[in-house]
Each structure stands twice: as structure tokens, then as C-alpha cells.
């Protein structure tokens, strides 16, 4: 059993985790000579590649000098806390990857804390030392201090450090002397990370993730905790709620390279996939047929944000998407629940076409919406709401730890913006010409903060936040102050009309786009909502005029991403999401009806 190492990779967004794993796979000869390696094997869905973040964890294994190294990729974002904990449960050690210039970031801290609590042995990799003005020694100190803050044990604090550049494909003991391969790192992994303990006895396997194949159905993935699993043996599945079910393993697979390989038995400590089980959830245990002993299930963080999902009932319903009915959306949400641990879905007040979907944050939910949109779904979502809790009779709300890194001249603006949203500044560090400011801020305050922070700092700010705890309610927070400009009629928007209305605010539509009554087409300069007619064309006469017409000079529209739309809308607005467009609209489309309901 000395020949297996299970290792989780922990890193902040864009510190080069996926690149490093690609290089490790090259070293382990996973690609044939001359095979095209386009990179980013792990971030395999389009969304992950576009945003440069890892959402779903994946398993890869490589062979190095006779030792099998299972590499588990973890999502770096605290919004995907559910994913992180499952992965760490399968590892014996972790690879902490930090940027030689930026140092450890708040997001990394979240995952690292979980890893240290589980007692994993860390190896620190200081990456990107080829960048100009990097500071590897300081970063090493920062990592050490961070580990101390997180109450690491003495054994954990005695961690080896490897310097290198994943992009250029080298790792070494000293950052001043580059080598030409990453062997040093792989040797360190085999040397430092403990081999999994061999536990004799009845078999136990905690299901920590799901795979799905259209041929065999759902596949359970997990690490054999104790004993040996054999192909075709009879087993018991112990569910989280205490019920048990007798069944049989059809096939066992281990991970080889990027694929599966069929095997007849798996010893304790290795990670495998079990085919042929029917009803199981993540957190269930596969145990002995005769006397089952379940393992404790995975504790997953509670959701902190919720959103209303509903079917698309706008005038453009069904024009762009393939799946629009409530049954389609319901099935899709149920499918998502199977593998997305931190998600909750409940029907909204006895309706069949509205759901309250709760998750770990705006990012967690918007990734789900974006994925559905690409699969061809049409739906509408309401404004993100924070989930309140009652603790000892006091109304409490989630509070997050927020870090903003900006050039010095913008620091006062940032502090002003965050304190207005009931944030408290906890520390401020000067790093050269930039400042690192830390706050505690209610989750409500973070909704819509990113856009404002980027505008105020001319796009220079780096912002990261993670859930901290529930604290007593902090009072009202003022939302966006500008009203919306709303289309009066359905039709095509004309440049002539938009041109005449430019001084009223900024537009979210271009001339020639189709709009419908009640759609939010722009942001008003004042606080009240303004209903405008953008579908009005110029009246032409047959009298020849002496002067020439003024040409309509229309300022290009403001383009908003899904997160920005979600953060922008008010309580009485929805975001309509279709595979081709995202539109903002009022819940009540008809102008007169909306007026009446406002009076009530």
C-alpha cells in the first residue's frame, strides 16, 4: 500500500492550479508523445474555462516512479463550500499553491482551514516566481503566519516549500536556480505525504461524489476507508437518515490517468468508482452485507442566500429556448440537487411554477443559472435575498469577511462605500503602492457591491469575500438609488426615439432590438421609474425640407453580465434568462396595472 498518495490541490483563482496539474500529467506521461495537449484538462466545462475558476472537482491520477498519485482538484471559491469538503475527505495531504507576488488570498484561507482541521499534511508550492517584482521569501512568511492563525499543528507547520513556475514547467528547492522539469515536486509528494493507512476489517466507503454515464447511470465515487471491495460482492448502503438497503456491486473502477479502468478489487486507501448502485446520495456509506457500520456523513455548510426561480412568462416566451415549461425546470433542479450538495430547492407558497432556490452566495446560484441557460433553458429569477436565522430570539443575518486590494489613492473611497453598507473595517495593510483592506460586512451589503467597487477604483480593485458567521441584524442598507427606464410598448427600438431620450439616463438596449412593454431598458438619472416609448419611429411627410436631418448619435448600450443583472434589479423586478439574451423586466408588465399596485 506504500504505492498510493491521495493529494488535494488548493489554490486561489488564477494562481495556476490547473496549469500545474496539466504539467504533472505531462510528467506522468499521460499524453502520448506528439499528442495535442491543449491545456486545462481539469476545467473541462466551458463556464470554468471562461471564468478561469474551478467549480466541479475532478479526479486524475498519474504514475510516478511506481507510485500512483491521485490528484484531487478543489474549487477555490467559498461559494462552492459543498464541493470542497467532499474532496478533502478523500485526501491524505494537500498541495497549497500560492502566487509569488500576491501571496495567500481569503478564498485560499477558506479551503486551507478545512484541510488543516481534517489533519492533512501540507506542501507549499510558491508559483509564478518568473514574474517580475515577485517576492517569494515574503510570501513564504505570509503562508507560515496564515497557518499559525488557523491553528495548524507542529507537524503541519513543518511543511516543505517548493518554488517554481508551472507555466514554464519547472520546480526547484531554491527559486534562484531554475531546473528544467517538475520532478522535485513529485519526489517531494511521494516523500512527504503519508501513504493511506491500511485498515483491516469489514469494508467501508464514504460516497463523496457522483459521476454519471448515460450507459450505466449514476456512479458512486469515494475512497475505500477500510477493508477491501470486490467486484460483484453483496453490500449494504447506509443512508444519511439511518435507513439501510441491501444491494450488489456490478463493477469496480479505479482512476487511471483521466479515465476509469475496470478492476476486480480495491484496497483501503485507494479512490474508486462503484457502478450498478441504484438509490444513493452523497454522504451515504457502502458497508459490509452482514454487519454494516456506517461512517459519519459529511457536514456541509448551510445556504446563506436564496432566489426565486420561475418560468418565463414574458411576451417573448419560448422564442429562444428549448426547455421553458415548469416541468422541465423542476426536473433540471432535481437533477442538480443530486450532485450539488449545498443547494436547496423548495416550492414557493403552494405554486407549481415558482421555486425558492437557496445556495452559498450569488456566484453559486449564478453559475447554476448560467449552466441552465447554456443547456437551452428559459427562466426568470428574482432578486437575491439573504437567509435570516433566529438565534436565541435575536434576528441574525450572515456576515462575510471581505478583502479589497486597491491602489492607495482609492482606499478612502472603498472604506466609505463599505461602511455605508454597514461594514466594519478590521485591518489595513500597505503593500507597496497598493493597500489591502479587510472588513466584516453583512452578506446583503455585498449584493451589488462589486460593480460599484470596480467603477470607483477605475477597474483596479481585487475583491474577495467568504462567509464568516451569523451576527445580529445590522439595520437597513440603502439599495441602488437610481430608478429604471421602462418600455411602454412592445416592438422594435428605434434610434430616433433613443436619441431623443439619451439625456434621461443610460440605456441597456441598442437600436433595432426587440423590446416588450414592462422591460427595463435603461437606468434613469433620477430616483423614480420613468416609462418611455422607445418604439416610436420618425413621422415622415412628403414635403421636401430645406435643412438636413440631424443624424441620431446613439451611445452604445451598457452590457451587463448575469451577476451584475442579479445585483442590479430591485424587489419588483426579474431577470429573464434565455439562451440568447438576458433581459431585466418588471414583475408586473402592464404600465397601468403597475401604477395601481404601487398605490396599494
Regions found by a protein language model. Give the residues of each.
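Interdomain boundary/hinge elements
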Residues: 36-42, 150-162, 196-206, 242-255, ...
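Conserved nucleotide-binding/hydrolysis micro-motifs of P-loop NTPases
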Residues: 15, 27, 31, 77-78, ...
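Canonical P-loop GTPase G-domain recognition
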Residues: 121, 131-191
